[in-house]
Regions:
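Transmembrane beta-strands of outer-membrane beta-barrel pores
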Residues: 30-36, 76-80, 125-127, 180-184, ...
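Solvent-exposed loop/turn segments connecting transmembrane beta-strands
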Residues: 154-161, 182-192, 255-262, 290-297, ...
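Outer-membrane beta-barrel architecture
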Residues: 13, 57-59, 109-111, 165-167, ...
Length: 345
């Protein structure tokens, strides 16, 4: 149960009562893990954020009247295995450009919400990132095969900072969102450009579907020159909940300005077993190309289970296996086995 720290009524200038609240929330997630990669010794480790990144944060809102409210979120990632500040720690499978010491590397924004939708300003996850978790197997954990298989390409930047974000209200289950991160700090040697993203999502009954696009030009050499490391990602998600099983699938295409392309696909299923136990499995595949010729193929599969001890605490276990095969090169295989516990507050 999330705990309200502050809830007070303050007289507005109009004489009406404006409600304000601030809530402390968080997740602590730690796993014992063993992993091995071809030609390397097996590693036995303790990891923070097996299923969800460990974090704590503050969020609040103020009723401004007339259906308008102000809001804010400050969210820190940390390493529960060491206690270290993690900046954007635990943002599974993505790039985070914040320094490791960033106090609120996961989120830090202020905004306004009303009948028009919601605006946010600050360190806001992108509109593309909104959809990335919604059809992923093994509870969208670090053990989902898509994270190890798709990551062979380029991990998208999910929280670039310096962002403007807008999400629409729902229209019959359909929502739209867009975000843009400013390209700051232009110099004579850095043609800093922005990062834009959009999405459309549908959620109704057992069906979820989304389409998202993100173009990242946040780092390009030479003012006025063509970006050499700009990435364009297009992601489609779909899930269908049959009750006895929830089917999941995603497809992502990444195109870069250096003529590299990556086609990425994953499918999975979540199976509830009684009220407390959920089983999940998934398969992921990706193929990279340069100038139309295949350079590498990757695939992997995983299995996971979580058992709820309460509404806020669960234990979990997972196993993931992946392999990559460069064209004309040697196949590399890896495996990960984990068991962990997560508590949220």
């Amino acid at each position: 149960m999330k705990k309200s720290l502050i809830a007070l009524a303050v007289l507005a200038s109009t004489g009406a009562m404006a409600q304000s609240s601030v809530t402390l929330y968080g997740i602590v997630d730690v796993a014992l893990q063993t992993s091995k990669v071809t030609n390397s010794p097996r590693q036995n480790t303790m990891e923070s954020g097996g299923v969800n990144g460990s974090r704590f944060g503050l969020k609040g809102s103020e009723d401004l009247g007339g259906g308008l409210k102000a809001l804010f979120v400050l969210e820190n990632g940390f390493k529960a295995d060491t206690g270290a500040i993690g900046g954007g720690a635990g943002l599974n499978g993505i790039t985070n450009t914040k320094p490791a010491t960033a106090m609120f590397g996961r989120k830090a924004y202020v905004g306004l919400a009303g009948g028009f939708g919601e605006f946010r300003l600050g360190n806001v996850p992108t509109a593309y990132d909104d959809t990335a978790i919604n059809a992923n197997s093994i509870f969208d954990s670090n053990y989902a095969p898509a994270y190890s298989v798709w990551a062979g390409g380029h991990n998208y930047n999910g929280t670039p900072g310096n962002s403007v974000y807008y999400a629409s209200p729902s229209f019959g289950g359909v929502t739209l969102a867009a975000s843009y991160a400013l390209g700051e700090n232009k110099t004579t040697t850095m043609n800093a450009k922005g990062l834009g993203a959009i999405n459309v999502q549908y959620a109704g009954g057992p069906i979820y579907a989304s389409l998202a696009y993100q173009e990242d030009k946040t780092s390009a050499p030479g003012v006025g020159t063509v970006a050499t490391n700009a990435y364009k990602d297009t992601l489609a998600n779909f899930s269908y909940d049959l009750g006895v099983v929830k089917l999941l699938t995603s497809y992502n295409r990444q195109v870069a300005t250096d003529n590299t392309k990556s086609d990425q696909f994953q499918l999975g299923a979540d199976v509830p077993v009684g009220a407390a136990l959920t089983l999940s499995g998934g398969y992921a595949y990706s193929k990279d190309k340069l100038n139309g010729s295949t350079t590498e193929k990757r695939q992997g599969f995983g299995l996971g289970a979580k058992y709820a001890l309460s509404k806020r605490t669960f234990v979990y276990t997972a196993a993931t296996f992946a392999e990559q095969k460069p064209t004309g090169g040697t196949k590399v295989k890896g495996d990960v086995y984990a068991v962990g516990v997560q508590h949220s507050f």
